Amino acid sequence: MRRRLLIALRSNFYFARAALLLIGCVLLAIAGCRPQRGGTIVVGSKNFTEQIVLAELFAQQIEAHSTLHVERRVNLGGTLLCHQALLAGKIDLYPEYTGTALTAVLNEPPQNDPSAVFHRVQDQYRARYAVEVMPPLGFNNTFAMVVRGDDAAKLHLHTISDIRAFAPKWRAGFGYEFMERPDGYRGWVAAYGLHFAGEPHILDLGLLYRALADRQVDLVAGNSTDGLIAALGMVALEDDRRYFPPYEAVPLVRRATLDKHPEAGAALRQLTGKITEDEMRRMNYAVDGEHRDPAEVVREFRKAKNL
């Protein structure tokens, strides 16, 4: 009797184990058919305030509309460093500008039509890099040639052409990238026929306006959405010869990332056309001028926009 009971118990044990294994295999098969949830996505940025703000916006937007964990790797450096990090898979996305992508990355000549620039960049990034150029965020951030407000008033400066007579006595200050890129210093001075008093000072982007305010230089190349320009009483000169191409802000995302996590792309598309130049300028000033946390500034913006 005991022997039969032991045999029965042993048989039930093996049957139960086989059943559990079968159930486990079925559950694994079902899980494999479902879209992948969770995971980590890495957002990068260049080394200036607007980029850090936009990267934080991308991160919060993805976190709010997916189950993804978002890692922030901001302040990486210039355009080419971010581009290389994207291609190497060190980051999954970062904010870029269409004119920068066209000239500094693709090494193509500037164009003035925003739509043509966007579609050219989008097509080439897909073909060359397997990177998706998502729709513009809504604002253009072009280079701004900035002078002190008192100089602009005294010398009646409104356009870049207006400085030609004064440039030979002026010291200019630019970031390293502006000095090197195809749409930067060399083409700019040639287009406007400018000559300065010696070679330009190479300045860290965070020190440009301080150097101008302290009269270490007389002109700098900033960004048109910099909040400090007006706050410091400075003046951005009109690009009257339309030298600079459009620089529409766009998210750049690895195609492999979008294929793996389509919810990230859906979240980012909700940002299309949502930021005006004034809104971007105010966010930049909140960080630069009021020394507020970029994450807090972005949370307020997203709440105001119902994002």
Can you name each region flagged by the protein language model?
Residues 29-32:
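C-terminal motif of bacterial Sec signal peptides marking the signal peptidase cleavage site
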